[in-house]
């Protein structure tokens, strides 16, 4: 597999649909990790794109929650609690004792669990949204294909946020 100079896996130019979706999702997961690399704890907690309170550490925590929601709750139908507790259901809130290592470990555990849950599933297999979630989508059933495309979109959008935050912190751009 080819990688970018910063170590992210380059998605193949030609592949079957499943391989392509997984590769792009992995690329965007790796992009978020790159955006957080080399920073100190106080920098990861810095809300650097005013007026937003979003931080790089909060984004990592949020994506752990997003991974859990879409692969465990929606696709596999599991009743699992929020990754970082009921009072932090979206993952954005920071806790003074939790740094990047703990947040990344939780995020990577959620990524691994999601991979396990979809390993033998087909792209047309469906998960089930709550009525509230279905109101946004228009249907309570969503295919694994839909979930994977949504996850790519979710990471791409938040990686754009991470770009802005990182640039404000130390001037690093790209990736």
UniProtKB/Swiss-Prot annotation:
Superkingdom of this protein's organism: Bacteria
SUPFAM superfamilies recorded: DinB/YfiT-like putative metalloenzymes
Gene3D superfamilies xrefs: dinb family like domain
Keyword Nucleus listed: no
One Pfam match: MST
Keyword tags: Transposable element
Protein's recorded name: Mini-circle uncharacterized 19.1 kDa protein
Species this chain originates from: Streptomyces coelicolor (strain ATCC BAA-471 / A3(2) / M145)
């Amino acid at each position: 597999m080819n990688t970018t100079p910063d170590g992210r896996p380059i998605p193949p130019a030609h592949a079957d649909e499943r391989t392509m979706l997984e590769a792009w999702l992995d690329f965007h997961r790796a992009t978020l990790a790159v955006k957080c690399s080399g920073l100190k704890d106080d920098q990861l907690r810095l809300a650097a794109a005013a007026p937003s309170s979003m931080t790089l550490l909060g984004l990592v925590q949020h994506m752990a929650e997003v991974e859990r929601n879409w692969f465990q709750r929606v696709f596999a139908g599991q009743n699992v609690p929020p990754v970082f507790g009921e009072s932090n259901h979206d993952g954005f809130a920071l806790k003074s004792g939790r740094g990047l290592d703990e947040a990344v470990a939780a995020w990577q555990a959620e990524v691994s669990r999601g991979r396990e849950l979809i390993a033998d599933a087909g792209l047309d297999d469906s998960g089930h949204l709550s009525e509230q979630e279905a109101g946004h989508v228009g249907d309570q059933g969503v295919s694994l294909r839909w979930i994977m495309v949504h996850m790519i979109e979710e990471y791409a959008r938040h990686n754009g946020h991470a770009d802005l935050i990182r640039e404000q912190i130390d001037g690093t751009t790209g990736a």
